[in-house]
From Swiss-Prot:
One of its GO terms (biological process) is adenylate cyclase-activating G protein-coupled receptor signaling pathway. This is Glucagon family neuropeptides. It comes from the Eukaryota. Residues 1-20 form the signal peptide. Primary role of GHRH is to release GH from the pituitary. PACAP plays pivotal roles as a neurotransmitter and/or a neuromodulator.
Amino acid sequence: MAKSSRATLALLIYGILMRYSQCTPIGMGFPNMRLDNDVFGDEGNSLSELSYEPDTMSARSRPALPEDAYTLYYPPERRAETHADGLLDRALRDILVQLSARKYLHSLTAVRVGEEEEDEEDSEPLSKRHSDGIFTDSYSRYRKQMAVKKYLAAVLGRRYRQRFRNKGRRLVVPSVWTGIRDTVIITPEKRGKRY
């Protein structure tokens, strides 16, 4: 661990020093070239007849860089093209992000509901699965109620069955004489009795 951190620190310091030595004029010194009007040949003799004019030297000097690098890489006649391309790229990127987000959310909801990863064509929509689940729950609840009723009918015998049969025939009739609502059961053996 200590060797790793030392090596990382040394690499970081080396990188910083190299960056500043190449980027600043103070760091790395360039070879000093003095071009005076006196030009010397191979033997060391003065060649004054070959003097360099400042006009010819300006061609060799470093070109002045524009302050904005954008103008260097994209000339004014191509800026409209690149701007339109950038807008199109940004719009396409936004659309792709939305599509991938929808697909990701769909996969999350499918996993929560209990569906395994399937193809888009084979999977049912979530609303259909939801309605199927509601129907299954309602049907299973109905089956349980019928099983309980059947059990009670078997245990309680005839009395429960008779009461269950008459449940649909009970009527709520207001009594004219008392002004109170009474329940009247209409069956062949109990005609007109009040409960």
